[in-house]
Amino acid sequence: MHRLDKDTSGIMICAKNDAAHLSLSQQIQAKTAQRTYLAVVRGNIKTDSGVIETLIARDKNDRKKMAVVKEGGRDAVTEYEVLERFGKYTIVRCRLRTGRTHQIRVHMEYLGYPLVGDPKYSPMKTPFSIQGQALHSQTLEFTHPRTGERLSFEAPLPEDMHKIVTRLRLGQFN
């Protein structure tokens, strides 16, 4: 139904049949299915929340990456909310209004706050032990295609991200 970038942890939805696929696709298109992510970014985000609205397209210099562009891209909208600040790092909740490839990673890097451990958009070494970027698909909310019941699912943080958050809360690496 939707993709998770390589090395992004968390919850995904898969359709069991064609009718469910159609219903869920329509919900994603109509933005009635909600997807929320947690990220640990490098830097101290000053604003408590915001909306990032840009165009995103393939990077001209590296076809494996995406980039914010002035024209010729697809609309990409990400809402973000700062949950905790730790000197050099911030924990942020992101909600997708659109679902572009690498959208959160590109948007946070565009603001100057790349994801910790992101090998594509933030190749700097990190003091944390993490496989890939610190990005977790935390919640997914949608209407059941057959029953019409509103469903909400939440995935706990993976161990490596949980350790990062714990170390930040203990005052390490601030």
Regions found by a protein language model. Give the residues of each.
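RNA pseudouridine synthases
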Residues: 1-174
